[in-house]
């Protein structure tokens, strides 16, 4: 009997590409709506999964949120469920006649677990089948052929680390979400989501907003002198106006050059993209979640390397010059800047890992072959890659120190002499400052002197970029999950905008948890669990042991909660999130309501005595902002749709304008 070879990939389009690379006689087979691929001459089958085809869940008898005790929920034995039955059926069918199974899922923790889940299905019908694993970082012919020429063993420790994360996140997420949702009265579609990583991340945003709200600006004073062609500044700033005025009065009509320096400064090139830096740069154009989805599509279609990586050093196995030469057909000017050098040496970051290289282009794409957003991400990856190989930028840097009656002034100037990598990486603006050539002893006339009163500014809100960086610093989540955490906070209406602003519900949830179960909101506990999962991957700890430790940790948190206070504070806080302002007719509270027909509107809390209402758009996610209308005691409203944010402004002003236009 001829035995078959079964190759398992993570997604269908990867299966299709790998099949076409390895075999010349590929036929597409179908079962229901699922396609898979067969090479008759090799009797090889390539089956693409849909990511996880098996999911973990709680037993059905624990589905009732209000009746199931939380301690029982967190101690429950989780059950596995096959969620893609057709794919499972195909795997079993082929596995029965297979003598070799190759796992070709993505090479990371999640990919290893996805492969192991499929293997368990295979081994349920063929327990003795030979199994191997191939690892690759790009879906290109060269990479795939190289990977299949040197298969390795499946890394069960790596898969178990992902399994531990899956179990812990499910246990913590379900338990805490039920805790908060039930005690706030927010269940059904409107439930309040809480999670192991999500909640400490949300606290960062809420705490920053509180810093901004509580910030008290302080006045300070700075002294400037204007000269022909430049402005100089006194190096010190003063909290006392009197002290500043005293010094200001000493300034004469001229200033003498005490020191003038001029030097050439080389500016280093950007380092190769790892996931964190890629998402931070991509967030200039779109949400990190969208950027990662597009990067994965480009990877599976052979245009860029694997986008989930910590590495910032190109391995010597990558033929950098070959890639640049190939890219010259689409980026000729940029490629020429790189190729015109006598020697090409790439920049290096601090982190070097052996699993995947930094993100780099693996195929040449033309603008017309990709969607607008796909091209934006592809171009970003290409330009970053070329910039890491380009010459350094060179600046002419100047500095002058001047003196006027004992009052010192300093000015700096810089001009870009050789653009180098800056001619390629167009996302980083070169800020130039004029400063003429001077020499020691020159006496310059002061055209104007200024004493400026300024105020200290509050810290800035977190942008997608700065939040990802802070999450990495605090070990919140992983390179593969941070963008998903941020997206979850947006979709659950905890945060909006970019930079991010928290909703009233976010304040309520975090403030209540800080008082009743602060551990949940701190990064320490989550970082500890991340370290434990690393130990599983290294084979130093067992998955059940880490999961049980996390259950015990959560149990202690639940037992320390004051449930009466939790319930009271949550219900009061959640109510605030629906309050839009004061009713102009009776002074009651205007709140967001829903009609029997399911339409949302703004109504008065004193209904039926007061029937004042305002219409609202029916599509998109509604956000009540902290900004209040200048004319009415009503907060402004924003709507988030697929196209972005729409600032509706004051709903009452909006309604009055509409009424005026349509009268």
From Swiss-Prot:
One of its GO terms (molecular function) is DNA binding. Residues 155-558 form the Topo IA-type catalytic domain. A zinc finger (C4-type) spans 583-610, 629-653. InterPro entries: Topo_IA, Topo_IA_2, Topo_IA_AS, Topo_IA_cen, Topo_IA_cen_sub1, Topo_IA_cen_sub2, Topo_IA_cen_sub3, Topo_IA_core_domain. Its EC number is 5.6.2.1. Gene3D superfamilies: 3.40.50.140, Bacterial Topoisomerase I, domain 1 (3.30.65.10), Topoisomerase I, domain 2 (1.10.460.10), Topoisomerase I, domain 3 (2.70.20.10), Topoisomerase I, domain 4 (1.10.290.10). The active site is at 306 (o-(5'-phospho-dna)-tyrosine intermediate). The keyword Protein transport does not apply. Keywords: DNA-binding, Isomerase, Magnesium, Metal-binding, Repeat, Topoisomerase, Zinc, Zinc-finger. Residues 4-137 form the Toprim domain. GO terms for biological process: DNA recombination; DNA repair; DNA topological change. The record marks 52, 165, 169, 308, 492 as: Interaction with DNA. It catalyses: ATP-independent breakage of single-stranded DNA, followed by passage and rejoining. Its cofactor is Mg(2+). Belongs to the type IA topoisomerase family. Releases the supercoiling and torsional tension of DNA, which is introduced during the DNA replication and transcription, by transiently cleaving and rejoining one strand of the DNA duplex. Introduces a single-strand break via transesterification at a target site in duplex DNA. The scissile phosphodiester is attacked by the catalytic tyrosine of the enzyme, resulting in the formation of a DNA-(5'-phosphotyrosyl)-enzyme intermediate and the expulsion of a 3'-OH DNA strand. The free DNA strand then undergoes passage around the unbroken strand, thus removing DNA supercoils. This is DNA topoisomerase 1. It comes from Archaeoglobus fulgidus (strain ATCC 49558 / DSM 4304 / JCM 9628 / NBRC 100126 / VC-16).
């Amino acid at each position: 009997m001829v035995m078959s070879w079964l190759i398992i990939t993570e997604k269908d389009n990867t299966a299709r590409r790998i099949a076409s690379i390895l075999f010349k006689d590929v036929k597409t087979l179908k079962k229901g709506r699922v396609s898979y691929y067969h090479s008759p001459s090799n009797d090889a089958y390539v089956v693409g999964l849909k990511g996880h085809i098996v999911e973990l869940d709680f037993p059905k008898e624990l589905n009732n949120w209000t009746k199931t005790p939380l301690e029982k929920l967190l101690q429950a034995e989780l059950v596995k469920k096959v969620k893609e039955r057709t794919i499972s059926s195909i795997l079993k069918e082929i596995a029965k006649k297979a003598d070799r199974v190759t796992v070709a899922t993505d090479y990371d923790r999640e990919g290893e677990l996805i492969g192991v889940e499929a293997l368990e299905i295979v081994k349920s019908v063929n327990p003795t089948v030979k199994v191997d694993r191939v690892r690759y970082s790009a879906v290109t012919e060269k990479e795939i052929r190289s990977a299949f020429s040197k298969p390795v063993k499946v890394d069960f420790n790596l898969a178990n680390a992902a399994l531990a994360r899956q179990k812990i996140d499910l246990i913590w997420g379900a338990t805490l979400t039920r805790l908060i949702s039930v005690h706030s009265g927010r269940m059904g579609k409107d439930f309040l989501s809480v999670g192991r990583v999500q909640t400490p991340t949300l606290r960062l945003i809420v705490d920053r907003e509180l810093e901004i709200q509580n910030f008290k600006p302080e006045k300070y004073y700075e002294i400037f002198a204007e000269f022909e062609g430049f402005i100089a500044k006194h190096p010190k700033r003063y909290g006392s106006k009197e002290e500043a005025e005293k010094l200001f009065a000493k300034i004469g009509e001229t200033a003498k050059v005490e020191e003038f320096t001029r030097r050439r400064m080389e500016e280093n090139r950007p380092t190769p993209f790892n996931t964190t830096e890629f998402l931070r740069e991509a967030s200039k154009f779109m949400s990190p979640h969208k950027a990662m989805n597009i990067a994965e599509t480009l990877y599976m279609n052979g245009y860029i390397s694997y986008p989930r990586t910590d590495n910032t050093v190109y391995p010597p196995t990558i033929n950098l010059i070959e890639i640049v030469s190939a890219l010259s057909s689409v980026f000729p000017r940029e490629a020429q800047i790189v190729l015109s050098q006598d020697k090409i040496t790439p920049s290096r970051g601090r982190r070097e890992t052996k699993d995947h290289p930094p993100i780099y282009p693996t195929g040449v794409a033309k603008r017309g072959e990709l969607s607008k957003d796909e091209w934006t991400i592809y171009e970003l990856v290409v330009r970053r890659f070329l910039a890491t190989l380009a010459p350094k930028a060179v600046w002419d840097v100047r500095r002058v120190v001047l003196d006027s009656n004992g009052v010192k002034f300093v000015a700096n100037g810089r001009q870009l002499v050789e653009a180098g990598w800056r001619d390629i990486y167009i996302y980083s603006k070169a800020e130039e400052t004029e400063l003429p050539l001077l020499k020691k002893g020159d006496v310059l006339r002061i055209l104007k002197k200024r004493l400026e009163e300024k105020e200290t500014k509050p810290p800035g809100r977190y942008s997608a970029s700065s939040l990802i960086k802070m999450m990495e610093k605090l070990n919140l989540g992983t390179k593969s999950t941070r963008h998903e955490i941020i997206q979850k906070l947006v979709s659950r209406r905890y945060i909006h905008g970019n930079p991010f602003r928290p909703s009233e519900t976010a304040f309520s949830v975090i403030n209540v948890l800080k008082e009743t179960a602060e551990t949940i909101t701190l990064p320490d506990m989550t970082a500890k669990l991340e370290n434990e999962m690393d130990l599983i991957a290294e084979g130093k700890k067992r998955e059940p042991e880490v999961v049980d430790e996390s259950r015990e940790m959560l149990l202690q948190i639940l037992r320390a909660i004051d449930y009466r206070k939790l319930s009271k504070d949550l219900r009061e806080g959640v109510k605030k999130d629906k309050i839009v302002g004061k009713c102009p007719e009776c002074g009651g509270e205007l709140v967001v309501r829903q009609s029997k027909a399911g339409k949302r509107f703004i109504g008065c809390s004193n209904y039926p005595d007061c029937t004042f209402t305002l219409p609202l758009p029916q599509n998109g996610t509604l956000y009540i902002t902290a900004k209040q209308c200048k004319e009415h005691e009503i907060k402004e409203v924003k709507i988030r749709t697929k196209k972005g944010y729409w600032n509706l402004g004051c709903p009452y002003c909006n309604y009055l304008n509409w009424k005026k236009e349509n009268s």
